[in-house]
């Protein structure tokens, strides 16, 4: 068996970078005012390859990349190949809000590792994959000042601060197999883990009043399963139609939450509340299930188009009543609901095997998406939506199917009818490297 040490070294290096990223604390890996609700912003699953096509992937079959959006897609590969995928992402955001007090504007940018996945064959038409990706991100920092003259006259200036950080990661192990050369099925075991910190402070300029600090630290963990299938039908010598579907089970989250509240004056602190709530099998917090369907049409390795739809039900999540998933002092009523996503994308490669012009070997992609979040605000049920366009290119490197994907995601998040809600404009840059090598080939001697 021939093993490429360079590919193995790059894969190991990427693995330790991911481990280091999941252990970081004290810095935001993501930032959004809307991440104050629930367990934060749900991370869009997929590699740089699928993200550059609007986030599709349920019906994608490409032997050159690892498509971990659908467990059944792991079977689309060379039967003797080892594959790895490593990605990073940078979010650049501008926030706008119009209220009775005026117009407000701010900006933020963050950097995070988006995925690390390994895949290799098991036997004949079956294959295995293992990886880690973010599931949700929390990152926000609010500051406001008391404006009531009666309160200011009694206590002096009062500052309210709220900030949060952390998130949930998902580690997954999956396998798939192909039957009758057309039907592929796959299954995945998912382990959720992560820490979310949410803090609220009230600070008085009058030292005769004690500052109030309160917050929640949640350690979450849980397991679930995901299933997928793909059916590929040839429509001609090069043309093929693929139907795909995925389903992720809902799950009760375990772990614990530390709830605290204390008052400080100078260097002295008095603990007012400190307790630990155990979440194990309590049903207090529950991640919603998710159903996805997709259809794609492709012509060999020249072009492909795809449309996906996803629906996730979070109405029984328990976030509405559990304090640790809210921010103290928030004026908005948070309610879990059903999230939906519509995604469409295309890929075009002029000539993958061209030996004269490098740019003809480059793959060009684009896509559109509309995402409705898993929560709404206020009794009237104001939805939070995201809409955007994506662009991307994959540049072949080294030899074989190795490539580097660079993509952009331009979009807006918020309520498109209500300008009093924060409008989040973003330009996301993502870079992914897919490594491909033949490991399970016997050397022949003459």
Predicted regions and their residues:
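Bacterial N-terminal signal peptides
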Residues: 9-18
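N-terminal, post-signal peptide beta-strand-biased segments of exported outer-membrane/organellar beta-barrel
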Residues: 21-136
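Outer-membrane beta-barrel porins/channels
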Residues: 24-52, 121-446
């Amino acid at each position: 068996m021939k093993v490429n040490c360079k590919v193995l070294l790059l894969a190991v290096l990427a693995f330790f970078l991911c481990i280091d990223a999941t252990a970081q604390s004290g810095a935001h890996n993501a930032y959004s005012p809307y991440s104050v609700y629930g367990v934060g912003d749900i991370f869009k699953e997929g590699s740089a390859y699928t993200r550059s096509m609007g986030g599709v992937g349920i019906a994608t079959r490409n032997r050159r990349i690892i498509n971990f959006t659908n467990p059944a897609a792991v079977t689309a590969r060379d039967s003797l190949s080892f594959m790895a995928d490593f990605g990073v992402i940078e979010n650049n955001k501008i926030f706008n809000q119009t209220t009775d007090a005026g117009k407000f504007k701010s900006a933020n940018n963050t950097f995070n590792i988006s995925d690390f996945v390994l895949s290799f064959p098991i036997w004949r038409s079956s294959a295995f994959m293992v990886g880690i990706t973010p599931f949700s991100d929390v990152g926000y920092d609010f500051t406001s000042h008391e404006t009531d003259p009666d309160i200011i006259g009694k206590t002096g200036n009062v500052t309210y601060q709220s900030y949060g950080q952390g998130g949930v990661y998902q580690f997954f192990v999956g396998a798939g197999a192909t039957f009758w050369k057309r039907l592929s099925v796959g299954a995945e075991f998912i382990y959720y883990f992560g820490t979310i910190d949410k803090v609220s402070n009230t600070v008085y300029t009058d030292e005769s009043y004690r500052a109030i600090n309160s917050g929640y630290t949640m350690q979450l963990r849980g397991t679930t399963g995901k299933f997928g299938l793909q059916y590929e039908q040839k429509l001609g010598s090069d043309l093929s139609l693929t139907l795909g579907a995925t389903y992720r089970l809902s799950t009760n989250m375990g772990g614990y939450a530390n709830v605290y509240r204390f008052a400080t004056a100078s260097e002295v602190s008095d603990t007012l509340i400190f307790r630990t709530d155990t979440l194990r099998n309590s049903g207090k917090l529950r991640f919603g299930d998710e159903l996805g369907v997709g259809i794609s049409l492709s012509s060999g390795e020249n072009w492909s188009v795809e449309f996906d739809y996803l629906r996730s039900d979070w109405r029984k999540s328990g976030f509405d009543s559990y304090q640790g998933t809210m921010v103290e002092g928030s004026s908005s009523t948070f309610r879990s609901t059903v999230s939906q996503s519509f995604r469409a994308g295309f890929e075009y490669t002029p000539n993958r095997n061209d030996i004269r012009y490098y740019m003809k070997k480059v793959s060009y992609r684009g896509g559109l998406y509309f995402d409705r979040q898993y929560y709404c605000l206020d009794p009237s049920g104001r939805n939070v939506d995201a809409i955007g366009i994506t662009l991307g290119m994959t540049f072949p490197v080294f030899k074989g199917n190795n490539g580097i994907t660079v993509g952009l995601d331009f979009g807006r998040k918020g309520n498109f009818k209500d300008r009093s809600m924060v409008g989040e404009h973003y330009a996301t840059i993502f870079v992914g490297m897919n490594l491909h090598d033949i490991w399970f080939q016997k050397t022949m001697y003459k």
